Curated annotation (Swiss-Prot):
Family annotation (InterPro entries): MAGE, MAGE_WH2, MHD_dom
GO cellular component, one term: nucleus
Name of this chain's protein: Melanoma-associated antigen H1
Keyword Phosphoprotein: yes
Region spans: Disordered: 1-84
């Protein structure tokens, strides 16, 4: 057999073995944390898009959540988009959903309590994400999807998360609640239930939740 053909076969065999190993790791992770499989399966491909480059500026990082929301809405038509797919998107959608259902902010301790059900702990390496705290508190914040800041007058200091300006631009309340409905349909006992509606879309959102996303198509 020609040497070039042998070399290609060896490379193909190595690539196939690597793919098999990656699938085994992901299957193991999902079997240990059933909610993880539910969250990933519940995330539609068009729920969120985002840039691979760093979109944030020092001004964005220092804005209040209210300023971020109004600024994002004003910039909505001109914000560039590119694919932000896969497991990171599922993780981000989980956090955005939690922030929303907790009344537009979520304390860091609660975020990690919920993510713990996905097999993610701060300071502990995850087989898929690596360092989850770095992704959540650095990458998602740097890209403008989350705002991460101290809780006023907390002692010892606590931190909380808000939707960042890019999350307001690239997602929506209905998309996030559609995601929550699908997750709840699989593992409702793992999600908090103290919803705090604050918009004119209450009836439509409640319909999504009550239906468990069966037969409902988000706009």
């Amino acid at each position: 057999m020609p040497r070039g053909r042998k070399s290609r076969r060896r490379r193909n065999a190595r690539a196939a073995e690597e793919n098999r190993n990656n699938r085994k790791i992901q299957a193991s992770e999902a079997s240990e944390t059933p909610m993880a499989a539910s969250v990933v399966a519940s995330t539609p491909e068009d729920d969120l898009s985002g840039p691979e480059e760093d979109p944030s500026t020092p001004e964005e990082a220092s804005t209040t959540p209210e300023e971020a929301s109004s600024t994002a809405q004003a910039q909505k038509p001109s914000v560039p988009r590119s694919n932000f797919q896969g497991t990171k998107k599922s993780l981000l959608m989980s956090i955005l959903a939690l922030i929303f259902i907790m009344g537009n902010s979520a304390k860091e301790a609660l975020v990690w309590k919920v993510l713990g059900k996905l097999g993610m702990q701060p300071g502990r390496q995850h087989s898929i994400f690596g360092d989850p705290k770095k992704i959540v508190t650095e990458e998602f914040v740097r890209r403008g999807y989350l705002i991460y800041k101290p809780v006023p007058r907390s002692s010892p200091v606590e931190y909380e998360f808000f939707w960042g300006p890019r999350a307001h631009v690239e997602s929506s309340k209905l998309k996030v609640m559609h995601f929550v409905a699908r997750v709840r349909n699989r593992c409702s006992k793992d999600w908090p239930c103290n919803y705090d509606w604050d918009s004119d879309d209450d009836a439509e959102v409640e319909a999504i939740l009550n239906s468990g996303a069966r037969g409902y198509s988000a706009p």
